[in-house]
Amino acid sequence: MSVTKVHARTVYDSRGNPTVEVEVYTKDGMFRAIVPSGASTGSHEALELRDGDKSKWEGKGVTKAVSNVNDIIGPKLIESKLDVKDQKAIDEFMIKLDGTKNKSKLGANAILGVSLAVARAGAAAKGVPLYQHIAELADMKKEPYVIPCPFFNVLNGGVHAGGNLALQEFLIAPVGAESFHEALRLGSEVYHKLKALAKKRIGSSAGNVGDEGGIAPSLSTPFEALDLIYDAIKEAGHEGKVKIAMDPASSEFFQGDKYDLDFKNPHPDAKNKLSGAQLGDYYKTILEKYPIVSLEDPFAEDDWEAWTNFFPKAGVQIIADDLTVTNPERIQTAIDKKTADCLLLKVNQIGSLTESINSAKLAYGAGWGVQVSHRSGETEDTFIADLVVGLRTGQIKSGSLARSERLAKWNQILRIEEELGASNTIFAGAKFHKGQLL
C-alpha cells in the first residue's frame, strides 16, 4: 500500500517552540506524527533544521523543514509508490534524497516526521498495533512482550531548571514493582511525597516544575537533591522497591578541560572545577551513599578517557547519550573503547525509525542495554511508548508524573500492558538492563 498524500505543518512543543507535524495518507486513512526536540543536545546529532530568522520564533522556526516535506519528500514519496509496510525502503529513500551525512539538506526533523507517520501507516496496513509492527520490523521476539521499567525524572537541575544545581536529572525507578500499573502508582506516590517535602524544607516555590515535569527547587549540590528524593521514597513506604538514577548531562558543564559544578552560579567557586578523574571520584562518593542503579552521561561527549577510566569501577548501569547520539559510528567507538553498557535511544538524534532500530540492535549485539528516551521539548505524540515495547528494551524515561506531554507516554504504555494482558507480558522491573533477553 503506497502513500497518496503527505502534508506537514508547524505545531508547537512543550516549550512553546515550533516543531514539525507530518500527516501521511493511504487508502486506510491519515496517520500523524510530531517530532520532538532537545535542549541539551549532543553536537554529533543529526541536524534539526531551524529557519534561523531571528525576527520570527527567535530563529527557531521550522518552515524550511515543513516546506521540505510538502515540496520535496512528499511528492517524491508518492511518485515512488513504495509500500508503507516497507519501512526500510522508505527511510533509505529519504536518506538518499537528502544525500548528506547528518540530514542537513532536508533536516532530520523533516525526515523523522515522515518516517514515524509511515510506521503508523504500515501498522494499519498490516492490521496490527504499532508496537507489534515495530517488533516485526526489528526482527524481535514478540509475545510475551516486555513492558519497560519507567524512569521518572522527579527533580530537574542543569539547563532544565533554575537554581545552581549543575546536574540535570534525578530520576526514580520502581524496579520492585510487579507491573507497569504498579510502577506508575509507586512513582506517583513518591513524586507527591517529594513535592510536599521540598515545599516544607525549601519553600512553596520548590514545588515548581521544570521542563520535564520534575520539581525544580533551588538547590546547590546533588547531595541535597538526593537526600530529598531518598527521604521521599522512605516516607512513601517504598524503600527497596524504588531506586534512584541520575543524568548529570555533563557536556553542559564541561568547560575547557574541566567540569564546572558551579557553572550556573554568577559567582562560581574555583574549587568546584574538577578534572574527569576528580568528577569520577565525586560520582563514586554519591554511588556509595544512595541506592543508585543507573548513571547517564557522567562525562562530556568527547571526553573518551574519563568514560573509559570510570566505567569498569562504576558498578551501576552507565548510559551513553551525548557520547553516542544514537549514531552507529559513535556507538561502535563507544563499544570498542568500553565506555558504557547502555545506549540512550532518541529517534530524533539519528532521524529515522530504521536507523534507530539498527542502533538498538548494534547495542544489543555488544551486550549493552537500551533505554528509550523522550526529549525535553516534547509533544502529545506517543510513538516512543510503542517503540519501547516493540524493541523489548525494558526501560524508558519520559519525564515525571506531571505535564500532559509526559503522561501521554506513560498512559499509552498502561494501555498496551492492559491490552496484552498479564499472560502475554513480562514487566522488566529490576531486570531492566537486559529487557531484550527476557
UniProtKB/Swiss-Prot annotation:
Mg(2+) binds at D247, E296, D321. One of its GO terms (biological process) is glycolytic process. One of its GO terms (cellular component) is fungal biofilm matrix. Homodimer. Keywords: Cytoplasm, Glycolysis, Lyase, Magnesium, Metal-binding. Mg(2+) is required for catalysis and for stabilizing the dimer. SUPFAM superfamilies: Enolase C-terminal domain-like, Enolase N-terminal domain-like. The gene is ENO1. It is found in: Cytoplasm. The active site is at E212, K346. Pathway: Carbohydrate degradation; glycolysis; pyruvate from D-glyceraldehyde 3-phosphate: step 4/5. InterPro entries: Enolase (IPR000941), Enolase-like_C_sf (IPR036849), Enolase-like_N (IPR029017), Enolase_C (IPR020810), Enolase_CS (IPR020809), Enolase_N (IPR020811). The lineage of its organism: Eukaryota, Fungi, Dikarya, Ascomycota, Saccharomycotina. Belongs to the enolase family. This is Enolase 1. Its EC number is 4.2.1.11. It catalyses: (2R)-2-phosphoglycerate = phosphoenolpyruvate + H2O. Its cofactor is Mg(2+). PROSITE patterns: ENOLASE (PS00164). Substrate binds at H160, E169, E296, D321, S373, H374, R375, S376, K397. One of its GO terms (molecular function) is magnesium ion binding.
